[in-house]
Amino acid sequence: MPTRMITNDEVTLWSEGLGDPADAPLLLIAGGNLSAKSWPDEFVERLVAAGHFVIRYDHRDTGRSSRCDFALHPYGFDELAADALAVLDGWQVRAAHVVGMSLGNTIGQLLALDAPERLLTLTVMLGGALDVDFDADLEAALKGEPSVSGLPVPSQRFLDMMTMLQQPAETDEELLERRVEKWRLLNGEGVPFDADEFRRRELLAAGHAGTFDEPIVHHMIPLPPVSRGAELSRVTTPVLAIQAMCDPAAPPPHARHLANRIPGARVVEIENMGHALPLAVHEPLAAAICAHTRAATV
């Protein structure tokens, strides 16, 4: 599988291409503090088998990409969106199907607004619309209060995950088990959690990065202003919003709320899916994405 190191200003980004470069390009944008390896190989193989040349990459401050001193050189979502475009440039891709999860969901919306000519389609999941103040909703959840947005706040599982990540872990074994426990909580209660499956993935991700320590920098990045949500009405890219029905971070109807703000956007609900990508959801998730990309190219 070919890899490329791509430079965007002073940042170097690790990226990987899978499949036939002659096939329709599809860019995967991972969640916060996650590397390219957060997209499971088995899931990527389904996208490749459906006729896509899949590109995945490490966000800055993850995996094998550049580490930044955030205090001295802070960055935000505009820079992360520029990184995604730099990856496309690095693979000589003029326009691609884009799939973003969690933090990548936000980046995808910004790309649809600011660089629509680079998107063939957009699929977003495991996140909210730009007009939702997630930080305010999270604070409300911590206080046991209703959300500012009127949408469901993150669940207790998500709050438990945040608390768990603050607990000390020193050895590689402790760090690994904490990573697995994080995914158990994010997985939700719909799909039975396979600890061995996620342990294998986390060993792969840690080996890729060269450390069991998890990045935390993306937690410091301010969200885009909610005023940008009003701009979603001018999006012309075909958009699919996937609602994971057991997502503890962005419960239903967050995807429906997002789709209602974008002309022509569609919603697909995936039963039992949480804020994770266990093997059990790969088939319906890949099928939904590929049906969306095919429909846009007919």
UniProtKB/Swiss-Prot annotation:
Reaction(s) catalysed by this chain's protein: rhodomycin D + H2O = 10-carboxy-13-deoxycarminomycin + methanol + H(+); 4-O-methylrhodomycin D + H2O = 10-carboxy-13-deoxydaunorubicin + methanol + H(+)
Gene Ontology terms for molecular function: carboxylesterase activity; triacylglycerol lipase activity
Keyword Transmembrane: no
Protein EC: 3.1.1.-
Listed Pfam families: Abhydrolase_1
Entry-linked SUPFAM superfamilies: alpha/beta-Hydrolases (SSF53474)
UniProt-recorded name of the protein: Rhodomycin D methylesterase DnrP
Primary gene name: dnrP
Family indicated by similarity: Belongs to the methyl esterase DnrP family.
Entry annotated with the keyword Protease: no
AB hydrolase-1 domain span: 25-277
Pathway entry: Antibiotic biosynthesis; daunorubicin biosynthesis; Antibiotic biosynthesis; carminomycin biosynthesis
GO biological process: antibiotic biosynthetic process; daunorubicin biosynthetic process; doxorubicin metabolic process; glycerolipid catabolic process
Alphabetical UniProt keywords: Antibiotic biosynthesis, Hydrolase
Highest taxon above the source species: Bacteria
PANTHER family: AB HYDROLASE-1 DOMAIN-CONTAINING PROTEIN (PTHR43433:SF5), HYDROLASE, ALPHA/BETA FOLD FAMILY PROTEIN (PTHR43433)
Primary role: Involved in the biosynthesis of the anthracyclines carminomycin and daunorubicin (daunomycin) which are aromatic polyketide antibiotics that exhibit high cytotoxicity and are widely applied in the chemotherapy of a variety of cancers. Catalyzes the removal of methyl group from the carbomethoxy group of rhodomycin D (10-carbomethoxy-13-deoxycarminomycin) and 4-O-methylrhodomycin D to yield 10-carboxy-13-deoxycarminomycin and 10-carboxy-13-deoxydaunorubicin, respectively.
